[in-house]
Amino acid sequence: MLNSSRKYACRSLFRQANVSIKGLFYNGGAYRRGFSTGCCLRSDNKESPSARQPLDRLQLGDEINEPEPIRTRFFQFSRWKATIALLLLSGGTYAYLSRKRRLLETEKEADANRAYGSVALGGPFNLTDFNGKPFTEENLKGKFSILYFGFSHCPDICPEELDRLTYWISELDDKDHIKIQPLFISCDPARDTPDVLKEYLSDFHPAIIGLTGTYDQVKSVCKKYKVYFSTPRDVKPNQDYLVDHSIFFYLIDPEGQFIDALGRNYDEQSGLEKIREQIQAYVPKEERERRSKKWYSFIFN
């Protein structure tokens, strides 16, 4: 009876303290009973995350941060370098192929113009330059030439076109180191003598050569290049009359053949790019004939 009373008293005491008997003897429990203080203390011994991990995943001993293998770092370094190199190579290849494609298209255009020009534009002519020397179609060979037809009494159009021609000559010479022969052929032989042309052209680029001739000579060369010619035949130098003519620049290759014409739709910059492209795409006649005999000649046709 006495033992039962003691058990009951102990249970009542523990129930009031809200502590299990097992908790008194288990250090990892939630609560620890302090008999001397009469209060409950919360334990700071928290369960570590590693205690819940499987044994095969627990870290044994001190944790060691091993350095990344040199081979791995090398391959990572090489990978991004190879990527950059591939991008640069792709960009360079695209730019090169684009430029080659443009040159090939320009070359085909020039070949088509030559085929047309050999029948319709150009041919033999005899004129006199502003130094009094003869000038024929043979003087067109060996260099690129630009022909322009005008007259010294032109009030506005011819000076504007000669200014544009001056710009092209200067840019090609200074930036591309390309020498081109600029020719100014007069459509007014009665008034444009060699001395008059020399004085008139002195206001423009010094490389421009003035050409003139007799009425029949000038009319003949205008006809060969399909230039509109309206100058009356029997006129006096002091007589006032109108001269009308076509407004084109004719680009001639070193073989003396027509390859392109530039009208007023070309400004200074676009005309310069057009001339530059034609010169860069130029292929000598011997090379064109050699290509035409190869099995891959269809590429250039």
Curated annotation (Swiss-Prot):
The chain crosses the membrane at residues 82-98. It comes from the Eukaryota. GO terms for biological process: cell redox homeostasis; cellular response to oxidative stress; intracellular copper ion homeostasis; mitochondrial cytochrome c oxidase assembly. Its main location: mitochondrion. Cu cation binds at residues 154, 158, 245. Keywords: Chaperone, Copper, Membrane, Metal-binding, Mitochondrion, Mitochondrion inner membrane, Transit peptide, Transmembrane, Transmembrane helix. It holds the Pfam family SCO1-SenC. Residues 101-284 form the Thioredoxin domain. GO terms for molecular function: copper chaperone activity; copper ion binding. InterPro entries: SCO1/SenC (IPR003782), Synth_of_cyt-c-oxidase_Sco1/2 (IPR017276), Thioredoxin-like_sf (IPR036249), Thioredoxin_domain (IPR013766). PROSITE patterns: THIOREDOXIN_2. It is found in: Mitochondrion inner membrane. One of its GO terms (cellular component) is mitochondrial inner membrane. Acts as a copper chaperone, transporting copper to the Cu(A) site on the cytochrome c oxidase subunit II (COX2). Belongs to the SCO1/2 family. Present with 1480 molecules/cell in log phase SD medium. This is Protein SCO2, mitochondrial. It comes from Saccharomyces cerevisiae (strain ATCC 204508 / S288c) (Baker's yeast). The gene is SCO2.
